[in-house]
Amino acid sequence: MAFLHFDNRFIRELPGDPLTLNQPRQVHAAFWSAVTPAPVPQPQLIASSAEVAALLGISLAELQQPAWVAALSGNGLLDGMSPFATCYGGHQFGNWAGQLGDGRAISLGELIHNDLRWELQLKGAGVTPYSRRGDGKAVLRSSIREFLCSEAMFHLGVPTTRALSLVLTGEQIWRDMFYDGNPQQEPGAIVCRVAPSFIRFGHFQLPAMRGESDLLNQLIDFTIDRDFPHLSAQPATVRRGVWFSEVCITTAKLMVEWTRVGFVHGVMNTDNMSILGLTIDYGPYGWVDNFDLNWTPNTTDAEGLRYCFGRQPAIARWNLERLAEALGTVMTDHAILAQGIEMFDETFAQEMAAMLAAKLGWQQWLPEDSELVNRLFDLLQQAEVDMTLFFRRLALVDVSAPDLTVLADAFYRDDLFCQHQPAFTQWLTNYSQRVLSEGVLPAERAARMNQVNPVYVLRNYLAQQVIDAAEQGNYQPIAELLEVLRQPYTEQSGKEAYAQKRPDWARHKPGCSMLSCSS
């Protein structure tokens, strides 16, 4: 086995929990607790990511060795690993929830390879002091979704945590999938997720809310030093402000990327916001099928729609304001925090305009384009048009003689296609004139559009089909779907089934259109 260089700075440099009592409790004056993953009876590695293994300097053959399977299942540790769970708080659905923490995530350590730092974290490896009423476990259903989505997002070009492995534990876990009083046993599983840092907004909020100023100052300085080393040259008087602005900028860019691919996170609580601007915590997420700004995959949010597709940027801004409030308890220059929020607004507006221009095949965004785009969004929503298919097919339109039938298979209902055909035809005419005004060659326009409009996304029903197969003991579809998702912008021969709009049977099927936080 290759030598592994672990450098566990988080637990070496930040205060830890002096108690070793591994049961749910309040933890004060500490950012982490030492924990031991719970052993599992029959660990089986059923999926892995070659790209993530390469980041860590590990081969897939090594991952399959007993020592690695033991480490990835919580049954053993490799030299240098020192498992811990972290303490943080957060706002959940707009309300302060107090201490939350890693309730079933256990970090194994920080691995250094090619001068890059990667924290390895097991999700579903047992109880920690932050588990509250949970069992610290995860089921196969949610673990497959996290594994696939982590890698799908990366290949789409969306900032994200990664997934190294998916291990079946051999356990049966009780879960009430829709919190309706009908619990069932499901297979247990563990995902090893990987990121340069798993620090969240909530890590800063909890000490601020508790008045632990020294602790908060330590975390701010540690985060800048470890995770933002390029800011070390900044004068100490402005370093924190520049850092917060960078957090605001990366968060704004993330929201634009989510919008571009039609991703809905489902539970954008402040404890689910990465300080690095990564997509983190894949729970009741979903991909937009028929375009709907009010759509949420999360049953818990079905009435309030707080975290629906169209509100994600505003929620990200709200979350940044809560982070600014926390930082403001130890940063006297509140104006510089306000500047960070302004940077979010400016960055989001600029990046959103550039992204929409790219999706529509324009070389640049013009102020008058807003009217054309808003009209398109209205039509897409009213006519129940598949977002992914529509934008991909739009590149095929001959703008010198626009024909709506090129886009017909993106519509879910023939009656709505007929009803909205005149309005769509008029929009397509206006769109074509806008494209022609730039004088771009058709092939050049199509190539540019195809770089940002994917053919393949992790549609909810595709994930559910893989889950159904895995629960019957067939794990090959996981690898097959992952292989397709590795090249989301390239038409792949024989893979047409992965590029179809949602079938009728999946419209209201649990796991395809409705999800919960149960995992």
From Swiss-Prot:
Coiled-coil regions, chain positions: none
Q: Which residues bind Mg(2+)?
A: 272, 281
* Active site: residue positions: 271
Kindly give the Pfam families that the UniProt entry links to this protein: SelO
The entry marks the following residues as binding ATP, namely 101, 103-104, 123, 135-136, 193, 200, 281
Provide the alphabetized UniProt keywords: ATP-binding, Magnesium, Manganese, Metal-binding, Nucleotide-binding, Nucleotidyltransferase, Transferase
Under Enzyme Commission nomenclature, its number is 2.7.7.-, 2.7.7.108
GO MF annotation terms: AMPylase activity; ATP binding; magnesium ion binding
Q: Which domain of life is it from?
A: Bacteria
Show the catalytic activity.
L-seryl-[protein] + ATP = 3-O-(5'-adenylyl)-L-seryl-[protein] + diphosphate; L-threonyl-[protein] + ATP = 3-O-(5'-adenylyl)-L-threonyl-[protein] + diphosphate; L-tyrosyl-[protein] + ATP = O-(5'-adenylyl)-L-tyrosyl-[protein] + diphosphate; L-histidyl-[protein] + UTP = N(tele)-(5'-uridylyl)-L-histidyl-[protein] + diphosphate
Output the NCBIfam families linked to this UniProt entry: PRK00029.1 (NF000658)
Q: Which family does it belong to?
A: Belongs to the SELO family.
Q: What does this protein do?
A: Nucleotidyltransferase involved in the post-translational modification of proteins. It can catalyze the addition of adenosine monophosphate (AMP) or uridine monophosphate (UMP) to a protein, resulting in modifications known as AMPylation and UMPylation.
Protein's name in the database: Protein nucleotidyltransferase YdiU
Gene encoding this polypeptide? ydiU
